[in-house]
Amino acid sequence: MHCPFCNADDTKVIDSRLVADGHQVRRRRECLVCHERFTTFEMAELVMPRVIKSNGVREPFNEDKLRNGIQRALEKRPVSTELIEQSINRIKSNLRATGEREIMSKIIGNLVMEELKLLDKVAYIRFASVYRSFEDIREFGEEIARLEK
């Protein structure tokens, strides 16, 4: 690794530790030329499948888009950021577990709805009403009835 101080190629690892619940490695390094010390963080780069939208357009998976949709549904609801992040991580893990290089956006939407159903029923109804394009109050009632079963 290049030294950020003198740009030398020769650095050595002094200490390594697992951080972020074992998802990252923190390394203390020392430059063999200028002897400055610095910290690096290393984590696995996991490839997410491309998303095939309902109109057939393919686009890279966008975690921010996923997070924004979930947060919008949970707006002003009593759900912690930690629980939201756990849900996002479960969704991403499920998508990677398919082993597919491309995945339909409908599958992502269904995973989001399942997570919201566990987190907050009101947020689930909010998301479902937009995702499934509810036309009238009857559709809300039908979805609420399904939730109560």
Curated annotation (Swiss-Prot):
GO terms for molecular function: ATP binding; DNA binding; zinc ion binding. Its cofactor is Zn(2+). InterPro entries: ATP-cone_dom, NrdR-like_N, RNR_NrdR-like. This is Transcriptional repressor NrdR. Belongs to the NrdR family. Keywords: ATP-binding, DNA-binding, Metal-binding, Nucleotide-binding, Repressor, Transcription, Transcription regulation, Zinc, Zinc-finger. It comes from Tolumonas auensis (strain DSM 9187 / NBRC 110442 / TA 4). A zinc finger (unnamed) spans 3-34. Binds 1 zinc ion. The gene is nrdR. Residues 49-139 form the ATP-cone domain.
